[in-house]
Amino acid sequence: MPLFSFLVLTWAFIQNDFSVAYVANNSNSALPLFYRISAVWGAHEGSLLLWILVLNIWSISAIIGGRHLPELFNARVIGVLGLVSVGFLAFILFTSNPFDRLIPAAMDGRDLNPLLQDPALAIHPPMLYFGYVGFAVPFAFAIAV
């Protein structure tokens, strides 16, 4: 589900769907496609959605990699990762929804913060999140012991 949500938000940026408040606040029709895609995680709400997506990728990796572990231990690891995921999902749902709508829709967006209009935005947050969020797996293993 987070992958679908992330792809829908990315599509909203690609299509310049300014009825989505997050898109209207972080993009405009003159922004190059490269930066529109990078803008998906360029602010708080999209960044949290990327965080949840990466957490799910790590969780699936732990589930696949943990098949050889004792069943009870593996269940505890999956349970801890599930609780972490539920916490982030609740946070994004109640405080940072990237799909809030603007009614009426904006004619054009505000633009991505000029400081973020750098090619590094395309790789820095995803790589950073794969490292940060990856620590949820050893945390889950430590709690499961």
Locate predicted features.
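Polytopic transmembrane helical bundles with strong interfacial aromatic enrichment
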Residues: 1-145
